[in-house]
Amino acid sequence: MTDYQKPLPLIDEDSRPYWEGAKRHELMLKRCTRCGRHFHLEYECWDCAESSLEWVRASGRGTVYTFNIFHQAYHPGFKDDLPYNTAVIELAEGPLLVSTIAGCPNEEIRIGLPVEVVFEDVTSEVTLPKFRPAASRPSPLTPLPKVGEGK
């Protein structure tokens, strides 16, 4: 794990509970103690302006909100991964999270694809949450619901 060549997150006091959770293979979110809304890394609730947020374990499930396939390495650590993807995941709890889709050919990634979190221990200190297609995902022949048709 010591030869990881890609950029690593900056872990500070505000984000430490998130990264400690990832190390335990748990996806952590903040939740408003007043209204229950979930957030990724915020300082107060967007809905009720409550500043009392608590860290809670998330379900780890979500859907692909949007994604991009990179055919050029913008950092030398990614050159052997070309083409690689990045995705914005809409978590079941509501927040959006930028990550990667693993265990799925890039050609099969679609907006609305159900996903679940997996963890990659990249160094002795850092574990990255990534996502893979959920076990209950539709087959490639099953069209995904159109926008506005519900979940």
Each predicted region: which residue ranges?
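Short, conserved secondary-structure segments in the cores of folded domains
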Residues: 54-55, 87, 105
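Residues located in well-ordered beta-strands
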Residues: 31, 61-63, 88, 100, ...
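Well-ordered alpha/beta subsegment
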Residues: 94, 99-136
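Cys/His-rich short segments
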Residues: 23-61
